[in-house]
């Protein structure tokens, strides 16, 4: 039970979980941006600029996109997107597994 953990350990666990979620968001957002480029909705430079702005607006440094885990998982997320560049519901479990096991 987390309540039994010391405050130091609780903070460390929270930090690890937050970092994982930030990487997950960045990887999925990057996959979405690349999908929009592939569809011709955005140019590559527009997609990069929009993604960087979105991340900064959330207080996330875009350098997270260079994280090896994000770089590895983002293309795999892209394969789970549907025609509208959103997560295809039939791939939701696979996406959750990527989040849990890869990031």
Predicted regions: what they are:
Residues 1-12, 94-103:
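Charged, low-complexity, intrinsically disordered terminal regions
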Residues 44-103:
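Compact alpha-helical subdomains of small soluble proteins
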